[in-house]
């Protein structure tokens, strides 16, 4: 593998044995691609905004004399960029402008004569835009739209598993689900009649819908039944014989062949042998006794040829009398329905008999009554209702997916078709459900991923937009019919409010529009790749059963079987597997390598769950020889959802990677294959809660996916194009682009601005730091700056800690964690949290609130940190209770006399009395002010601080743009100087030229002169561009802010809080091994090894065996080896000053070559001495290793690593007790584990209360930290005190410490006076009980004597 300059800084040793055929696809593509399809103009009009417009327009007036047509749309430019939207608290969106055409037709002239056409561009609201990282900024906060897994439209056949009827009989049903429109269900009842339901309403006999579709009884019978033909003879009947139909029947008569030989005697059962004999003798007719026909059903109406009277009606039971009537009328032939109990049931025949209707009109009326009970049906209304249910494109749409699923399920060859149902579709569904009831077909599995599809952002936004358009459509149609259209323009017809309201509602408050989880890069990526079965049109937690939540065989490579929440949402919220993607229909696909004749090719194909069932697929870890041929005879594979063994020649596909089945979060867990799935689930979930530490540290033991994740998440800055680093400071990186990557006529400079100390959604700190230096070459995709939780472009969620598995004085009982004081001293787990506190000044009825430093009844010291405008200065250290923004509110005064009121109205004098309503630091918070923002309403005078901030921003913008201009100008000038050099100017001449004269020189060569003129033009453009950009920036900064009604001013103060690690904080490894810190131990008391190095953390060994997460032990061993190798390299670097680099080079080469069949090849010999030295220096802290899931380091390789590091291969060391110096009685497992600090900090949870707020009804203290509440003393605690006999304690708990109002106020006074006595009274809850009993009509009074 070829490494770029920056990749050579630190190479992760990879233990992977399988070749990487396919890189992990871009992780956010599910979000970005979906939204791109929504906003991009689609000429076919099948998706996105275009489809929504085309489905609603043209809108015709009721009279048909005018219509509004859609022409095209365009999205404008957003007013503010993403960062500005976040600061100002507005939505990042672009205006949607639609070109509409209004056509007026001439009433008098022939139909279709156009009288007038008006075209106009109409504003139709703002559409929120997606940022480059797949999020939306809605009202200043970043949100993610989670994709939804819902049941695909189409037709599904199912049964009730025998749960409906007491007999346990299985009742089959069919359901046609459209993308939008009414659901149509068919179902059997226990008596085997077929019923239909529309939209889950009352059921009707299924033949009603057939009658409504204009089928007669005769046609219905012909559709669903075969016939049996009889010829009527004098005393007998002759039946046309189909031998197969006799199978399994008991003969009620002798069955003879054509010669009269008896084949089956009466009373015997007809077997397959008898049928073969009948077929052999070519018997086509069979004489049967007259009684044989009794109980059969006529296949058609039989009419007396003379009188026209119906002798036997279709579907009626035939008796001997009917037969006699037919004989008398001279009818010689008779057809009956072929019915048998086994596989040709009489279902439709039975249904027809309970069907109350006889013709189409009656059927339509019956359907109308069921859909609109209580309304009088008319013929037209009934017709229109039925037509609109399933056959109108406006009301019903199966969608492309639905039609494809429908046709495939019913074996209709074409995948395309109409979006509405046809007569044939409904008949085909009925035939299929009867087919299933007869035992010829299987029901569907609704949890199969072929029957569930993904609805992503774009599709949901399109649906929501269509909802808004439909609301507008009604209004437009009315306006087209009412007004004088000659005067009106399209703009006057359209009101954009309903559209923007629908879109806003979706992005702002839909269940699937979620506040982005921004703890760390992994949590961001996982949130964007989340697939939820909940939400509108999906399941609900309560109704979701066990089957829906369970792992299904089709999840393989599509949804992760490990990563899902614990708790009520388990299995309903899933994560996309690493390589999965959605196809054009919205079904999940996963890639496979093609296998031809037992040889694995590198050709990759994506298969959906439905396609996968047809093939035989082997796993990625099968043995292959050097030519890619499978070695073993029998190969473990999957076929039709089952695991089985097959010959190599039968294998058709193979997995692309062992990590294919798991999500990115699960594939970050090293040695995942050695962990129990429950613990792996916790490990995957807890990595998302890791807080970014002050200094990120890459994991020593990783899985090789860390870099991909960090780059794809968008928190690091990656180079867009190759070049050389030209300039680096803390907030900007400038890259001079390579000549071959330049676009014609550009300056060739890329500027990357870094994000500094901003707040994330979870109040953690987002900060980017450059990790490159001037002069370094970069290629596209190289990491230039690290973000939160990344280290040299690798994801780094925690810290590598030296760990020992041993008990230590009970401090690691029940998963507690003992840590060394050194960890806190070195700030290993120190995190920075940024809080945003807002102070809003409103206009009240009594006058305006004012932000000022002049606050009543507040001492000088409390105001010491405020400036003259009453706002805290940046850099101030504040603690709980300090004033951040001084604010006074007018206070309601005593009743004014009419004269005073008049004076107040005339002179507009403010209320004289004000109260302090300043913004203070919350209790238990202390930190440093890092930023202040002031937003002032348009038309309100800005205070001094706001003007200062504005000036600072303008100066900063000028400086930034100026530097950018300078850099770009220098780029143009350097190209011009090179041009002059090539044209014969000497270097001294060029150096002597002033900057402005470089571009105005005259060159003899015409081509070069033209080029120089182009550069001069470019320079002018740059200048103009700079002025324009600065003007826009200045206008944005100085314009007033659009604040909510009644708000005059908002001051936002940002407070940085530094949190060191302390007892009560939650920590975890990556294997689901979580615990709480119990004690921070002095370094000298910690166990230490023979070299005197103490361990950092002591974990309980009992936490491993029962939890079955052995991965952590292997990680500790491999971590020890990696660290040991780092120490050896450090020692060699000390020596290399005398010996040179040869020893280091050999050792590093040895390390990278270690392991059997390892795919990674690092050509250390090709490294220059400088590169090697830089690599070695970066490896001093330990060589990072990658052990991919299901393809990781084996025990033998870990032992080889330990040997290379000069450590015992058992992975255990002798340890000594830090307090006594005595050796522990047996060796202890010591090594390095990657530990995370989770966002469950004791500072956020710890809370205490003495007095505070009380509940209104019960007068008991509230609960929870947010309400400043207390702990509930519940009934179990009462029982405990009763059991102890602690009567007085109990009395005080239930009275003065809870809801005895008088008692507690008295007690407070007593304590203040130093009198420690109490008099308990009546608890309020007793009064509540009395009132509740009185509400039942029983009067209870307390007799106080």
Curated annotation (Swiss-Prot):
CDD domains tied to this protein: RNA_pol_B_RPB2
GO molecular function, one term: DNA binding
Known catalytic reactions: RNA(n) + a ribonucleoside 5'-triphosphate = RNA(n+1) + diphosphate
Enzyme Commission code: 2.7.7.6
Keyword field: DNA-directed RNA polymerase, Nucleotidyltransferase, Transcription, Transferase
Any matching Pfam family: RNA_pol_Rpb2_45
GO BP annotations, alphabetical order: DNA-templated transcription
CC terms in the record's Gene Ontology section: DNA-directed RNA polymerase complex
SS bond partners: none
Family of the protein in this entry: Belongs to the RNA polymerase beta chain family.
Chain's role: DNA-dependent RNA polymerase catalyzes the transcription of DNA into RNA using the four ribonucleoside triphosphates as substrates.
Assembly notes: The RNAP catalytic core consists of 2 alpha, 1 beta, 1 beta' and 1 omega subunit. When a sigma factor is associated with the core the holoenzyme is formed, which can initiate transcription.
Protein name: DNA-directed RNA polymerase subunit beta
Organism, scientific name: Shewanella oneidensis (strain ATCC 700550 / JCM 31522 / CIP 106686 / LMG 19005 / NCIMB 14063 / MR-1)
The gene coding this protein: rpoB
